[in-house]
Amino acid sequence: MEETQPPPQPKLPLCDSLMIWLQTFNTASPCQDVKQLTSGVAMAQVLHQIDAAWFNESWLSRIKEDVGDNWRIKASNVKKVLQGIMSYYHEFLGQQISEALIPDLNQITECSDPVELGRLLQLILGCAINCEKKQEHIQNIMTLEESVQHVVMTAIQELMSKEILSSPPNDAVGELEQQLKRALEELQEALAEKEELRQRCEELDMQVTTLQDEKNSLVSENEMMNEKLDQLDGSFDDPNTVVAKKYFHAQLQLEQLQEENFRLEAAKDDYRVHCEELEKQLIEFQHRNDELTSLAEETRALKDEIDVLRATSDKANKLESTVEIYRQKLQDLNDLRKQVKTLQETNMMYMHNTVSLEEELKKANAARTQLETYKRQVQDLHVKLSSESKRADTLAFEMKRLEEKHEALLKEKERLIEQRDTLKETNEELRCSQVQQDHLNQTDASATKSYENLAAEIMPVEYREVFIRLQHENKMLRLQQEGSENERIEELQEQLEQKHRKMNELETEQRLSKERIRELQQQIEDLQKSLQEQGSKSEGESSSKLKQKLEAHMEKLTEVHEELQKKQELIEDLQPDINQNVQKINELEAALQKKDEDMKAMEERYKMYLEKARNVIKTLDPKLNPASAEIMLLRKQLAEKERRIEILESECKVAKFRDYEEKLIVSAWYNKSLAFQKLGMESRLVSGGGACSDTGACTPARSFLAQQRHITNTRRNLSVKVPATTSD
């Protein structure tokens, strides 16, 4: 009997098998033949399904779908697909594609070469088995036909072998690669044994079917022969007849056929047992194949981990070198940190600007228009803050002036009260003398004339001239002194106020810049901590971002440090001018004190002369009537001065109320800005992932009003009190 063998399955080429594999993705564009794939649209859609994060919508939109017969557009699309695959291998997988695997794009687009197209599809297959969804893609490959599976497995093996040859040598990697090669060889052997067993089983099945057919035919022939035997029983008794001879001959054939049947039954049983053994071996080989596939997947995963670890180790070495450089740079900044720590109490104002700038930098890529509006708002608020601080400084200076004026007016009031008391005493004395004089005038009018003439004659003319001349000189000296000294003092005070304003502006700017330096140093420390924590686990992109952030913060820190040095130089330049002004004011104050002492000495002499004159007049005639016009003039002057004092007191109260209202407005504005600042800080802390800050470097910051009070107190200590000049 001839054994019929099944025809061998034709081995599909690489391009056709990979096209069958591409059809499992169910892309929008067709991928049935080579010409449909040369447009590059179907391959781009397959790459988008393989890794949508890398081959995103923006990358897919660059692939033109309306291609037609334009080979240039096809070449552009296929070139973009190849560039995307190369970047995916190099940047995401960290692998180098060997030159043997890179296809010729001109052959694909112009000639529709299936060999070059198969190389390109082989690279897409490598992307699928190395991406995050590789288990799903491997399961899809296992559902294909066996011939397609065999071609796909050989393509994967070729791709992995060429990748292994192009990768740099390493001891640990070499061992894993050897294990991977051994696993792949065992997998190939198992697949070959599986194929042989399958063919052998098919051959045995064919033999069993042929034997079964032969058995059935023999059984039917046996039945026919039995029927003929029953019909010819009567003729078989005579052995000399032809029928008997045929009967004996048929009986011999029947015995031979029975023996052959028994032999075939035994062979069938043997084949059945052998088939069962082969099925058991097939099941064992399938289990072994599954184990080898799992081992191959594990080795592939280990290879991926090795590649990732190799890339991360290289990046970690680079990061360690950069961290060492940054450590050296940070060690150079210790002196600056010490200076900044001493001035941290006055650096809270700059935090508003830094927080707003950080928020604007975070939202810059998302909303450019919002960034511009926020910048304008921050600038307006900064201008308002500076204007309000300047206004508060000016109001503090005005309040100080009003207080000095108030003190001068109080001194003038006390002096006027003393003069009023003395004038009251003299007025009472004059009233008494006037009553006596009236009584004397009623008795004798002529006596008064004689007394007046007598008093005028008795009163020496020299004393009168001395009194008048001293009064005139006293008034002229006071007017000259008040005019010149007041003008000079006002000029010096204006210069001093201008210097103080400049000093305050520079101090505020210095405070803001130092706050910015502190914030930038805090950010640098956070970045350094994050670099130290990540170490070898950090990816290339995160390390590059951290480097860029650190470089940007270092540049900002150097710029702010240069601005701070410039402002400190300006403050040092202004300091000697202030010292000179203070010396001039001290000299003028000493001169004023000398002149006040001279004036007091002249007033004492004048009072002494007046007392002597009064005593002389009293000794001459106690009933003499003094001039009542001078008393009325003094009363009018006293009333005018009291009215002026009341007006000044009312103006001082109004100024105090205005100052109080402005302070309330400033405090309300500050509370509102502080609330916005807290909200910004909370959002920044939430978005930053709770970055830890150096608690030792931070000191409790003063509020806005406390800072303004501190500035006014220091300014008040620096300012010079000018003594009020006494007026007539």
From Swiss-Prot:
Q: Domain (Calponin-homology (CH)): give its ranges.
A: 12-128
Q: Listed GO molecular functions?
A: actin binding; dynein light intermediate chain binding; identical protein binding; microtubule binding; protein homodimerization activity
Q: Which residues are recorded with the post-translational modification N-acetylmethionine?
A: M1
Query: Which UniProt keyword terms apply here?
Result: Acetylation, Coiled coil, Cytoplasm, Cytoskeleton, Developmental protein, Differentiation, Microtubule, Phosphoprotein, Protein transport, Spermatogenesis, Transport
Q: Which residues carry this modification: Phosphothreonine?
A: T699
Tell me the segments the record calls region Sufficient for interaction with AKTIP and VPS18: 657-728
Q: Which CDD domains match?
A: HkD_Hook1 (cd22225)
Query: Where found in the cell?
Result: Cytoplasm; Cytoplasm, Cytoskeleton
The entry's family comment says:
Belongs to the hook family.
Q: How does it assemble?
A: Self-associates. Component of the FTS/Hook/FHIP complex (FHF complex), composed of AKTIP/FTS, FHIP1B, and one or more members of the Hook family of proteins HOOK1, HOOK2, and HOOK3. Interacts directly with AKTIP/FTS, HOOK2 and HOOK3. Associates with several subunits of the homotypic vesicular sorting complex (the HOPS complex) including VPS16, VPS18, VPS39 and VPS41; these interactions may be indirect. Interacts with CCDC181. Interacts (via coiled-coil region) with RIMBP3 (via C-terminus). Interacts with LRGUK (via guanylate kinase-like domain). Interacts with microtubules.
- Put simply, this protein is called Protein Hook homolog 1
